[in-house]
Every structure is written in C-alpha cells, then in structure tokens.
Amino acid sequence: MKPITIRPYTTDVETVKSVFYDKSTIDFNIDEDPRFIIDVGANIGLVSAYFAHRFPNALIISLEPEESNFEILKLNAKSYKNIVPIQKALWYVNTTINIFSTNEGNGGFVATDKKYNSDTSRNMSENYSLNIQPKNSIVETITIESIMDDHNIDFLDIVKIDIEGAEKDIFD
C-alpha cells in the first residue's frame, strides 16, 4: 500500500480502522481479477486505494460528492494510475441534488432531490433520526449507466456502495 492522507481528529481515523483493520468492507474472495470497480460514496478514497493496490489492472471509478472528502480523495488517488475520482453523487437520473448535513462529522450527510425547507428538514430528521441542517451544497449526479457509457465499461465486477441511506432512492 502507498501512503494515504487522512485528517486528524475526524471520522477519517475510524474509517481507516474500519477499512484496514476490521476489513468488513473489503474482506472477500474473488475468482478472477476484476477489470472495472465502482466505489460509490468513496469518502476520502481508502477503499479505492485498497482496491487499486489489490487489483492494479482494474479501473476504479470513485464517486464522492462532498467537497472536503473529495479533496482528500484526489490526494489519495494521485498515487494510483487506475483510480478516477469523480465529484458526483450516484442517483437514479443525471441531475443536481441538495446535500443536507447530519452534523455527524465529515462523513455525515444526506442527499435528496427535495428543496430544503422546515417540512423537508422535519421529515428527513424523522426518517433518519438525525438533526438535518442545510449545507448549502448542490451537487451533480450521475447514473450507473452514464458511468459505464462514459468509460466504455460493459460489465461491473465490483460495486461498493456507502451512500448514507440514499440506496433506497437509487434502487427503488
């Protein structure tokens, strides 16, 4: 593994422990080396870096919409020629969406295509049991189909998804 960048005194430290010590995200067997991997909700790129090291011939597309996480993801991707960082959120349509902070550190936010207002905040707070606050971020989204078309991918070998509960919005 090549050196990685993390932010001290943040949730990055817990993420390092989860990825590299608990290995709950990455401990699996695969019969053949994958060609195409998508890391959705890449955060600062730790899983992407692990995949790039483990599968040096695979193309790894790393999606992360949150700006501060994406900046660190870009730093961590620089050491690997096979990681392509993209600052977009995975969604069911190519559009823009709002990001709401959950006040849970740099990993905690909720993406929605609903505009922020007190009703949205109350509804999302009840659904997620969180204190939702506007983060004033609008991010571009992309579909799996668009990613595959943009990178001439015919088959995805591995898809890692960690998107703060938005999985339901994408796959419903």
Residue positions per predicted region:
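Phosphate/nucleotide-binding beta-alpha loop and adjacent structural elements of enzyme active sites
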Residues: M1-D172
